[in-house]
UniProtKB/Swiss-Prot annotation:
Transmembrane segments: none annotated. It comes from Pasteurella multocida (strain Pm70). The keyword DNA-binding does not apply. The gene is cmk. It is found in: Cytoplasm. Its EC number is 2.7.4.25. It is an enzyme of class 2 (transferase). PANTHER family: CYTIDYLATE KINASE, CYTIDYLATE KINASE/PANTOATE-BETA-ALANINE LIGASE. One of its GO terms (molecular function) is CMP kinase activity. This is Cytidylate kinase.
Length: 227
């Protein structure tokens, strides 16, 4: 794994990691790993099978047995659980909240660690998550940490819901983001934090195009490659 190029992108929910990682994978021709989706799939599987979200042992067993696939399709990544396309289902607020709760358990993280590391490929990997640079790929050649204020992330989420014709309460969204940040940053195992050697990008006042440009420039300098 040490001879394969791995670029990690960590950061809180709503900072723009997904958009950045997809753009980087497309421009560099790398494979994309959305680790957050793996936790969301685990949470969805738990909700579907009535496994309690506080049952660490049952959740870890469920995570170990997951039949999940990531397939590029129509400009995005299609996610299959037991052969079923669950790309839309895992993006609901209910599943997002469940995933944040599931992710605090050490046994669940252990069960999913090897699965994530197995995504490392010969043509390079963009790993999107919360502990990619600190735990899953500590020897990655390039590490980025994408951040934004809770208020800005809530605005983005609120706008996304509006664009989809879904009603949303801004104050509730902001409260949920802050609560999730607290859980992610204060969990006992693999808390959300930048790797010591990560470049920190604050996207609060940046367009996604500016974020992509800064990230690409940093990657090209460190890896001596061109997009």
């Amino acid at each position: 794994m040490s001879n394969k190029i791995v670029i990690t992108v960590d950061g809180p929910s709503g900072a723009g990691k997904g958009t950045l990682c997809y753009a980087l994978a497309e421009k560099l021709g790398f494979t994309l790993l959305d680790s957050g989706a793996i936790y969301r799939v685990t949470a969805l599987a738990a909700l579907k099978s009535a496994v309690e979200l506080d049952d660490e042992i049952a959740l870890a067993a469920l995570a170990s047995a997951l039949d999940v696939q990531f397939l590029p399709a129509d400009g995005e990544v299609k996610i299959l659980l037991n052969g079923e396309n669950v790309s839309g289902q895992i993006r609901t607020q209910e599943v997002a909240e469940a995933a944040s709760k599931v992710a605090v358990f050490p046994e669940v993280r252990k069960a999913l660690l090897q699965r994530q590391q197995d995504f490392s490929t010969e043509n390079g990997l963009i790993a999107d998550g919360r502990d990619m640079g600190t735990v899953v790929f500590p020897n990655a050649q390039v590490k980025l940490f994408l951040d934004a204020s809770a208020e800005e992330r809530a605005k983005r989420r609120y706008k996304q819901l509006q664009n989809k014709g879904i009603s949303g309460n801004f104050d509730q969204i902001l409260a949920e983001i802050k609560a999730r940040d607290f859980r992610d940053r204060n969990r006992a195992v693999a808390p959300l934090k930048p790797a010591e050697d990560a470049l920190i990008l604050d996207s609060t006042s940046l367009s996604i195009e500016e974020v992509i440009a800064q990230a690409l420039s940093y990657i090209q300098q460190h890896l001596d490659i061109k997009a």
